[in-house]
């Protein structure tokens, strides 16, 4: 087992294979879109879980290569499927509706965020993990600050 520094007073871990879907990319050579490449990766993960492998998954912005309604419906279905397979992991998202899954599965899902604060017209980060869904709209703040949004 690998040894890594951990910034905490105690830690309990359960050894599992780490599987990620973080840097999916498209391929003109293989005639494969970003979205299709992501679906293939998610299918590989589900297939491994169906075979009984114990995995810890880390997924970043799932289904971001499609429209928002399709993304939400597919993301909800994927999360439900992962829960049925008793999967542990982390899903990073900026989709506020996906954060509402905790209302349906309060014992299985936890929401955590890194909140950005706006102080003296500057964006600052504490880099502290907080419980809940991020409340600040830092994208609009940054766009306005850069002159990309004229009206509020």
What is the meaning of each model-derived region?
Residues 1-152:
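ATPase nucleotide-binding head domains, primarily ABC-like/P-loop NTPase cores
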């Amino acid at each position: 087992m690998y040894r890594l520094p951990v910034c905490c007073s105690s830690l309990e871990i359960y050894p599992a294979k780490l599987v990620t879907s973080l840097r999916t990319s498209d391929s003109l050579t293989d005639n494969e879109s970003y979205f299709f490449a992501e679906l293939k990766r998610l299918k590989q993960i589900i297939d491994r879980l169906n075979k009984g492998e114990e995995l810890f998954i880390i997924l970043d912005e799932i289904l971001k290569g499609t429209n928002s309604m399709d993304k939400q419906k597919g993301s909800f279905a994927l999360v439900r499927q992962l829960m049925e397979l008793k999967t542990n992991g982390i899903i990073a998202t900026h989709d506020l509706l996906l954060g509402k899954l905790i209302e349906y599965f309060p014992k299985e899902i936890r929401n955590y965020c890194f909140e950005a604060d706006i102080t003296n017209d500057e964006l600052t980060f504490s880099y502290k993990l907080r419980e809940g869904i991020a409340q600040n709209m830092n994208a609009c703040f940054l766009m306005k600050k850069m002159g990309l949004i004229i009206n509020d």
